[in-house]
Structures are given as structure tokens and as C-alpha cells.
């Protein structure tokens, strides 16, 4: 029960950050013609490509895509607890994991607002971490469009049964 309350509290705090309105600019300036809104299919294509880039980076132990693809305030929830962006970036090159291949499937996109999206999918990995087979997992990542760039702000994985 405490875990559920903690998770709910974290998600509530996270939602307040994601949905916060930007402060008004002090001086009004003519704004360029706004870009047309992306379709849901375009957003899913963009975010699934971003997820694949991060999975490739994890496989190749390359922290650079995590530095550029995660928001500064990003965090993940894993069996180790809450991990901040800097924890993830530091862990990537030294993770005791060997991944031969992976497959991502069953993609679904839920728009939480015009600039916040939840992408869910299944991740199947042929590999090991600390000598144990990596389980197939259901993944969820929340992205926020900040300054025209989609950045991951939250990630979580749950092993399938």
C-alpha cells in the first residue's frame, strides 16, 4: 500500500511539472508563424524513434543519447528505486549488462496534453544483466515537448508474466 501511495505521490508531483504553464514573456515580440501541430501518428513515430535510440545507447553502453534525450529533471523508477537523470547517465557505461539484441513492439501513444505524451510498449531483450536473463518488460515513458524538442521526463518498466 505504501508503495502505491509513493508512486501516486510521485506521479502527482510529476504531473504538476509537466502541465505547468510557462511564465509570460516580459516583452511581447512578434512571433514567427507557428508550426502546424504534429499528428498523433507523427508524434508516435518521433517518440518510438527516440526510445529506440535510447535502447541502442543502453545496448552499446553509450551515455550521450541519455544526456541529450532526457530532460534535466527526468527520473526513472526501477527495482533500485527512483533514479535521476545523472544516475542513469553515470550507470550506462558501467552497467553489468550484455545485450545481443532487443525487440520493441505493441506501441501505444496517449496524449496527456498538447505538449506531453505517454508512450507504452513491450521490450523483449536477448541478453543478461549481472549474469541473469533480462525479462521481457512493459515500458512506459512520458515525454514533454520543451522548446520544440521531445524530451523523456519519466520512464518505468514492469516485467511481463
Q: Which stretches of residues belong to each language-model region?
A:
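A beta-strand edge to alpha-helix "cap/lid" segment located at domain peripheries
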Residues: 21-68, 73-161
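Positively charged n-region of N-terminal signal peptides that target proteins for export
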Residues: 1-4, 21
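Bacterial N-terminal signal peptides
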Residues: 7-17
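Long, low-complexity, proline- and polar/charged-enriched segments
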Residues: 3-6, 113
Amino acid at each position: 500500500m505504501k508503495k502505491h501511495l509513493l508512486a501516486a505521490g510521485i506521479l502527482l508531483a510529476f504531473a504538476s511539472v509537466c502541465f505547468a504553464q510557462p511564465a509570460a514573456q516580459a516583452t511581447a515580440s512578434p512571433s514567427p508563424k507557428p508550426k502546424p501541430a504534429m499528428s498523433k501518428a507523427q508524434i508516435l513515430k518521433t517518440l518510438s524513434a527516440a526510445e529506440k535510440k535510447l535502447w541502442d545507447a543502453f545496448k552499446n553502453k553509450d551515455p550521450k543519447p541519455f544526456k541529450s534525450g532526457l530532460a534535466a529533471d527526468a527520473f526513472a523508477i526501477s527495482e533500485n528505486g527512483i533514479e535521476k537523470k545523472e544516475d542513469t547517465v553515470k550507470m550506462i557505461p558501467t552497467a553489468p549488462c550484455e545485450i545481443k539484441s532487443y525487440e520493441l513492439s505493441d506501441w501505444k501513444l496517449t496524449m496527456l496534453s498538447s505538449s506531453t505524451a505517454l508512450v507504452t510498449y513491450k521490450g523483449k531483450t536477448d541478453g543478461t544483466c549481472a549474469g541473469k536473463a533480462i525479462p521481457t518488460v512493459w515500458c512506459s515513458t512520458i515525454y514533454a515537448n520543451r522548446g520544440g524538442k521531445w524530451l523523456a521526463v519519466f520512464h518505468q518498466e514492469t516485467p511481463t508474466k
